[in-house]
Every structure is written in C-alpha cells, then in structure tokens.
Amino acid sequence: MRHRKSGRQLNRNASHRKAMFKNMANSLFLYKTIRTTLPKAKELRRVVEPLITKAKIDSVANRRNAFSKLRDSAIVAKLFTELAPFYKDRPGGYIRILKAGFRTGDKAAMAIVQLIDLETMTDTTAGTTTS
C-alpha cells in the first residue's frame, strides 16, 4: 500500500526523475514557458515554486541550495537577480499550468507551464535594455 507517499513516479527511477525535473526547471527559468505533459507539469510545480521562494532571500546558503538543485550557475544567477526580485511581493503561485489539448502520437494530456505575469516581466526587461 502506498499510504503517505507523496509525488508521482512517472514510470521512472529516482535519478531519472531528478534529472528530468532539473532540466525542466532550467528550461522554465530560461525560456519562461515550456510545453510538457500534464502530470509532469503538476510535479514540476513542486520543484519550481520552493526554488523561487528561497531565491527571494539572497544569501550564499540559498544560492548553494538552488545550485545543488539546478546545477547551472547562469540559471541560478538569473533566478536570484531577475526572477526573485520580480516576485518579491507575491506570496506563492509563481507558475501557471494551462491545459493544451492532447499529443498527436499517444493522446497524452499536454500542458503549457509558464511563469505568472510573463507579459509584464518581458515588458519591464525590454524597457530596461532599450533605455
């Protein structure tokens, strides 16, 4: 019986799941929107939201913790310098999961995962680069 076992297995072993969610989180922070299956998107929320919450407090320990999860120093720097200050007044719910129909090959439920307030984030960053 699987009482009190949280999280989805997704037909993968633990190391594969860890690597997959690391790559998906890196892609989400880099491109601000990704397309994946619905169960993976719902699990990705459990990985990404605590990272953004920790990044709001910029300390060496929090940066090392984020680096241990993401393993990419450029993405960690972007998380702490761009994304975390943008969400500093938001208490949670940093990503949006939109249902995007079904995949053609196997009819798997697809979803679009994007960072909340994406439009205003791109407008503010575009405005600062042109000024």
Curated annotation (Swiss-Prot):
> GO molecular function, one example?
structural constituent of ribosome
Which segments of the protein form a coiled coil according to its record? none
Q: Which NCBIfam families match?
A: L17
So what family is this one in?
A: Belongs to the bacterial ribosomal protein bL17 family.
- Give me the Gene Ontology terms describing cellular component: cytosolic large ribosomal subunit
UniProt cross-references to Gene3D superfamilies, sorted A to Z: Ribosomal protein L17
Listed name of the protein: Large ribosomal subunit protein bL17
Q: Does the keyword Ribosomal protein apply?
A: yes
Protein keywords: Ribonucleoprotein, Ribosomal protein
| Assembly and binders | Part of the 50S ribosomal subunit. Contacts protein L32.
Superkingdom of origin organism = Bacteria
Keyword Ribonucleoprotein among UniProt keywords: yes
Q: Name one GO biological process term.
A: translation
